[in-house]
Amino acid sequence: MNGFACSFPLPLAGLPLASPLPIPSLGVLRLLLFRSRRQAKLHICAGKLDSHQCQAGVVINQTPAEDQVSNNALTTGGAYGFEGATTSLTNELMPSSKRVTLIRHGLSTWNEQSRVQGSSNLSILTETGIKQAERCRNSLVNMTFDACFSSPISRAKSTAEILWQGKQEPLIFLDSLKEAHLFFLEGMTNADAKKQYPELYTSWREDPANFHVAGIYPIRKLWGTAREAWKEILLTPGENFLVVTHKSILRALICTALGLTPERFRAIDVNNGGISVFKFSKQGEAMLQCLNMTAHMYSDHIYNY
């Protein structure tokens, strides 16, 4: 049957002995096997479970015991509370699971002027960008963070200072959170860059993974930088972290956490002031909980996650 093995007994009761045994089709067998596996993961909920009323009547994939999770350290797919996660970003067991909140800096002068920013330190927050940073801070008023990491580049640094205002712990600046270096394109308007360097600009916009100058591939390099940043962040003592940085490195952070390659760079978009949230198992494996939340930009929304 095309190599498909049936791992459960076929129903024989009620079949005449003289009749040949009907052989289910491959599609039927797959459906039966799917249902069998699904039923093994489902537990009918009667009344209450752990003092929480079961809304849908079904409990799916109950949380495994802590010692069971620890036995899966450093293995892909052994993450806490979910299956088939990504490869460990720490390569070592952490003392606890962690949550990381990622925020892109507020609107900057070069954002407003449609200029290529890159790693330049000349672009600063606008008045709108300052208000966006304040909105981010207000939206997270119910959240507690053990540390805040930031790019040292001015637009991200200013955003982090607003977010971390009134905290006793100092901000932690990481060079691994700096934006990608885009060489002589930095500071140019997008229109001028497209006009003066059409092939290079087209490569940057349409095939960023293969965009290169003098043999240097900024986006491919950014993937290594992002992995370095994750390791620095996750191995810091604490359980809840805030990270403030730039669009390109945020894309790399999100993609590397999800196991995506540089070719997927533009598959992720993050707005100014956009908030994304990851949960990490003890094994350093990531689960994306929220991506580019912006409700706080248009209302007084307060997050609880």
Annotated model-derived regions:
Residues N2, S19-R37, K157, Q168, ...:
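Active-site-adjacent alpha-helix immediately C-terminal to a catalytic or transition-state-stabilizing loop
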Residues G3-S97, E134-T202, S276:
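Phosphate-coordination/substrate-recognition cap region in phosphate-metabolizing enzymes
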Residues S88-T90, P262-R266, I302-Y305:
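Short, P/G- and charge-enriched loop/turn segments at secondary-structure junctions
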Residues S97-G106:
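Short, hydrophobic/glycine-enriched beta-strand segments
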Residues G106, S151-I153, S176, V244-S248, ...:
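Short, well-ordered beta-to-alpha junction loops that form the rim of enzyme active sites
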Residues L107-L163, H212-R227:
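Loop-to-helix element that buttresses phosphate recognition and phosphoryl-transfer chemistry
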Residues W110, S120-I124, L163-E228, M287:
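Phosphate-handling substructures
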Residues A286-Y305:
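Acidic, His/Gly-rich catalytic cores of divalent-metal-dependent hydrolytic chemistry
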